Amino acid sequence: MKKHFLLACLLMAMGGVYPDVVNAQCGDNGDGTFSNPVFWADVPDPDVIRVGDDFYMVSTTMHLVPGAPIMHSKDLVNWEIVSYLYDRLDDKPNYDLKEGTVYGRGQWATSLRYHNGTYYAYFSPNDTPYKGYVYTTSDPKKGWTLSSRIPHFHDASLFFDDDGKAYIFYGTGQLRELKPDLSDVMPGGVDMKIFERDKEENALLEGSRVIKHDGKYYLLMISWPRGGKRRQVCYRADKITGPYEKKVILEDAFAGFPYVAQGTIVDDGKGNWYGVIFQDRNGVGRVLTVMPCRWVDGWPMLGDENGHVPATMSKPVQGYSSEGLVVSDDFSGEKLKLNWQWNHNPMNECWSLNARKGYLRLTTGRVVDNLFVAPNTLTQRMEGPKCSGVVCMDLSGMKDGDVAGLSAFNGDAGILAVTCQGSQKYLTMKTESVKLDEKNKSVTGIDRNEIQKVELTSDVIYLRLDGDFRLNKDIASFYYSYDNKDWKKIGTDFKMIFDYRRFFMGTKFALFNYATKSLGGFVDIDFFNYQHIKK
């Protein structure tokens, strides 16, 4: 069956299946320019640093693990995931989908810094026990070490001043001094509110990002003015403790979607500055834009000369490309590609790349009654404008009551599920909408809608999920095939959503297999073939 994977990849490269399919990073136009968004995929809460000629970025993935992806770039456009801060979180059993879940919690906005040869990253889950994580490394490509647990600081930004003192900016204008090694807060150190919100702000100021430029301190944040739209603001001061003055540095809708705000600025070492800011785009999640940053009267003004996010501009550095953020996989490697993430901590004994060479085996590890509490659901992002994912599954190892398949996974999920009922297997297109307890995020209810069910005639099945994230679309469509050529649509189109009250992330491709009766059944996944469609 690998031949089907190779053929599909060849057709994709030749443009034979979809004429606008590309392998390259979605923002790179291949002619020295790039188009925004750089990532039309879920890459929220970016923090970016430059060390020499290398850019590093961290983003938020919350309840997915491994978590806190660290990406590397040479040009701010082409990025690749090189590591994660952690393989799992173990503060409480919810991370294992026991006694509740951590949907929409886990790893939130992370701060990334480089100081005296060491890279630092800090984040704090928006959840009990409300303690932050500090990770360090000498090389982001070689993994990270948990070095300390310090107090919870919401949407924080680490900062090392020229005198070696360490600080953390957080919340709505809070400043706290830390020990230089970030092992704890500094006893008797700075602990203050550096400004008060003015009257036009009616909510939290969030997403702190701090830099020092020409002797001044700049704190970038997102704000929501009364009766207005989200925007990027900047507070600046001559002293770290203030007084601070404020200016709006970006207030712009882009391409018909909501306003662009929350991120940071970074220079290229040659005097040029850029903003790296995200934008909400509904079902696909929060997408990444890159734009000029112009210093005007000592303020970092974002966007073009008119303050707008440019649709297309020259790449900051020429000559680089990348595989992309979402990738195909024939599961022939010794490890999963870094593009994959599990939903919550995986049961590592229940998945394998070695049980059957060239296949990913997912073995049932816990008896559950729904996808939202099923362990070992494997995900990748979906991308706009359009994308398509095909998975080939060998179902012969399934047991009675097992459920396996492919999902457009979110709080509202579109699901293409194979169910094993005795000796017969059925394919169902259905939707499920989860209800979560506010305290521990346990599943309190699921609204289910079975749309179409067909009896399968083969133990080898190809499942396809197409996503359309163009303006006012957010549509998922489902198909199946016995030969990867003759495709039959099943069910109806499914509307993908973004809901901060539940998952707080964009919709994901999700591969799954879980038991509803007894353990030990398995499916073998031959490949996942991904196509990104630019038009």
Labelled PLM ranges:
Residues M1-Q25:
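Bacterial Sec-dependent N-terminal signal peptides
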Residues V21-K535:
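Carbohydrate-active catalytic/glycan-binding domains of CAZyme proteins
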